[in-house]
A protein has these predicted regions:
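An alpha-helical, amphipathic repeat domain used for nucleic-acid recognition
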Residues: 1-141
Length: 141
């Protein structure tokens, strides 16, 4: 079995380089501790206490990145965060930090770029709507 302090030190180093959610760290700790759930839980709590792991900070960074760089909408972001095990209140708070005006501009530019390819298609409007929904934008926006 791996030594507790070595695993803790390695995970602290990893967390200092990038953001991780609690579920990811728990999986890493379980693997490193060879399935010892109690020790992995203690490691996770210590990392939370020392602010190496913070689900709100992770969710906010994830939402900003996916919104700005990949053009995802709030629905797709919230589903992705829920799949990571982030609770609903944290997801709502993280999505609330996204600037609505910037998100609208990104949505508009993504849809306009797609429209250039669909303009001559008889089902172009339907396909554009479907594309926007698949990107995580709401129907009424």
């Amino acid at each position: 079995m791996a030594e507790y302090s070595k695993v803790l030190s390695r995970l602290q180093m990893q967390c200092s380089k990038r953001e991780y959610c609690s579920r990811d760290i728990m999986q890493k700790a379980l693997k490193a501790m060879e399935g010892d759930a109690e020790a992995a839980g203690r490691i996770l709590e210590e990392l939370r206490k020392d602010r190496f792991v913070d689900d709100l900070r992770y969710a906010a960074a994830f939402a900003r990145e996916k919104s700005r760089l990949t053009g995802w909408g709030p629905v797709k972001i919230s589903f992705a965060l829920a799949a990571k095990g982030i609770d609903r209140d944290t997801v709502r708070e993280a999505i609330g930090e996204i600037d609505d005006a910037d998100a609208f501009r990104r949505m508009k530019s993504v849809l306009l770029a797609k429209w250039k390819f669909l303009r001559d298609d008889p089902q172009g409007r339907f396909k554009l709507l479907k594309f926007g929904l698949s990107r995580g934008y709401e129907y009424d926006v």
